[in-house]
Design a protein with these regions (language model features):
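A conserved beta-strand-loop-helix scaffold within acyl/acetyltransferase catalytic domains
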Residues: 34-149
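Conserved small/polar residues in nucleotide/adenosyl-binding loops
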Residues: 166-169
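Conserved acetyl-CoA pyrophosphate-binding loop and the N-cap/start of the following alpha-helix
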Residues: 150-162
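Conserved N-terminal entry element of GNAT/NAT acetyltransferase domains
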Residues: 2-39
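Context-gated lysine
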Residues: 14, 19-21, 28-30, 105, ...
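Conserved short hydrophobic patches within well-ordered secondary structure
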Residues: 48, 162-163
Length: 169
């Protein structure tokens, strides 16, 4: 198992979190939601990979590498990263990687290039009629210092919804 990289300098992260990448503010806590890619925000991607590896190792998973970043994060038409940023703490609270079904590319055999492709045998009907209207979400994480034992990875949802939740399933 390799050591996890040190945190990325906050000035580098802030420089890449530009207004063009800002989706909106959260409903609570004055946090900000951004959408980035490894190509337009390489330092943010490194920090995402670091935080994912920290969180996943804590729960007995992880890649064993210095960061949790794979080919789906870095390929030409890479998955996008939705992150919650705390301007007050100047750090990433958590995030998801995602790909809209309408943006899915296909390999030379017509198979969708998705992180989950090895798990399913997608029918032609599914690919044509359903896939374009889906979103593949994955690699969700909440930075350890922002996790609660009650909400876990669902804490990102709760951060942005003003309704009081006792539990989510």
């Amino acid at each position: 198992m390799q050591d996890i990289i040190n945190p990325i300098d906050r000035a580098l992260l802030k420089a890449e979190l530009t207004k063009e990448k800002r989706l909106r503010s959260t409903n609570k806590s004055k946090n900000e939601i951004y959408i980035v890619t490894a190509h337009d925000s390489p330092n943010v991607m490194q920090e995402i990979g670091r935080l994912r590896e920290v969180a996943f190792r804590y729960y007995g998973g992880g890649t064993g590498f210095p960061v949790d970043i794979d080919e789906y994060d870095t390929m030409e038409d890479a998955y996008r990263q939705l992150i919650v940023w705390s301007p007050e703490d100047e750090q990433i609270l958590g995030g998801y990687r995602f790909l809209c079904g309408s943006d899915v590319k296909f390999d030379e055999n017509g198979k969708p290039i998705l992180a989950t492709s090895h798990l399913f045998n997608f029918s032609e009907k599914f690919i044509k009629e359903i896939l374009p209207y889906t979103v593949e979400l994955g690699r969700s994480f909440v930075a350890l210092e922002y996790q609660s034992t009650r909400s876990g990875a669902k804490g990102l949802f709760v951060l942005d919804n003003p309704v009081s939740y006792t539990h989510l399933t």
